[in-house]
A protein has these predicted regions:
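N-terminal amphipathic alpha-helix/helix-capping segment at the start of soluble metabolic enzymes
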Residues: 1-13, 106
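Residues at alpha-helix caps and immediate loop-helix transition turns in enzyme cores, especially N-
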Residues: 21-22, 131-133, 241
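Catalytic domains of carbohydrate-active enzymes, especially glycoside hydrolases
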Residues: 25-43, 105, 219-228
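C-terminal active-site rim and adjoining tail of enzyme catalytic domains
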Residues: 180-183, 189-291
Length: 291
């Protein structure tokens, strides 16, 4: 039992229930009472910030090819929800309304009627490189976001990436307490399988990712980023490092925590923020753990 429960962030919205990153998924997360929501962002060919995880369209839409090669209008013509198979209430919008830009998501959060967090993951490698960061910051600023407090009305904004260069770039513009350095263990076989690479290319890519992991750990060791964002597997495999970062004052946002035993691990470790595909279920579990 604990006296203060961790905050629960909805990973790509309530993405176990509805297709990730869709209007329906985020509206459901808000309705579930999530303390915050997480999103991944890419730039379109005409420089709009869209909410998608993959650099390609194939997995989560009826389109194909790179997100960066399409305009926003072209993306709006695609179906981003039917692949999931779940029907959603009419009030969550039509199929044609499910793709969201960052301004679209901000509109939904501002209407939540309560304080809510927004964790924005900037996806790299990007063909637009650090223009992605500049564009996201410009979108936020246009809405009245204050970079020092990282607040936009009722929305608490944090920015995060697995890319150490992107994180260092953000740290020059936003206080460290609002910047999350994502980190996870890199396994060569997982890289090869996920990216469908051969042994030589897969090994080379894995070595690059391992170097980035080491840089990320250095950033967190030094306290340059205020928020540590490890995967739940990393938390299990590196308890001493996790404890050291916590003791040194890093705030933790752990992903993706769906299984009850993983929630318990986070509670026992004193993790402050949990990112999950199942916000309603995790909220019930962490609520029951509060004294």
């Amino acid at each position: 039992m604990t006296s203060e429960r961790p905050l629960v962030y909805a990973h790509r919205g309530a993405s176990a229930q509805f297709a990730e990153h869709t209007r329906a998924a985020y509206l459901q997360a808000i309705a579930d009472g999530a303390d915050g929501v997480e999103c991944d962002v890419h730039l379109t060919r005409d420089q709009h910030v869209v909410l998608l995880h993959d650099p390609n369209l194939d997995r989560t839409s009826d389109g194909t090819g790179a997100v960066a090669d399409r305009t926003l209008d072209e993306l709006r013509e695609l179906d981003f929800c039917s692949w999931k198979g779940a029907r959603f209430p009419d009030e969550y919008g039509a199929v044609s309304q499910q793709l969201l830009t960052l301004p679209d998501l901000l509109d939904l959060l501002e209407l939540a009627g309560r304080e809510i967090g927004l964790a924005i993951e900037l996806k790299h490698p990007s063909p637009y490189q650090l223009r992605l960061e500049d564009t996201v910051l410009a979108v936020l600023a246009e809405r009245g976001w204050d970079s020092q407090s990282s607040r936009l009305g009722n929305v608490r904004v944090s920015l995060m990436s697995f890319d150490p260069e992107a994180v260092e770039y953000l740290l020059e513009r936003v206080p460290a307490e609002h910047i999350c350095m994502l980190v996870d263990d890199v396994q060569v076989e997982d890289v090869r399988e996920d990216l469908a690479l051969g042994p030589i290319t897969g090994g080379a890519v894995a070595n690059m990712l391992k170097a980035a992991q080491a840089d990320a750990e250095t950033i967190l060791d030094a306290g340059r980023a205020g928020i540590a964002g490890p995967g739940i597997g990393y938390v299990r495999e590196h308890p001493n490092r996790v404890r050291q970062w916590l003791d040194d004052g890093r705030r933790f946002r752990v992903w993706t925590v769906d299984a009850p035993e993983d929630v318990e691990l986070c509670l026992s470790a004193g993790i402050q923020e949990i990112t999950t595909n199942r916000p309603a279920e995790v909220l019930r579990q962490v609520g029951a753990a509060v004294v």
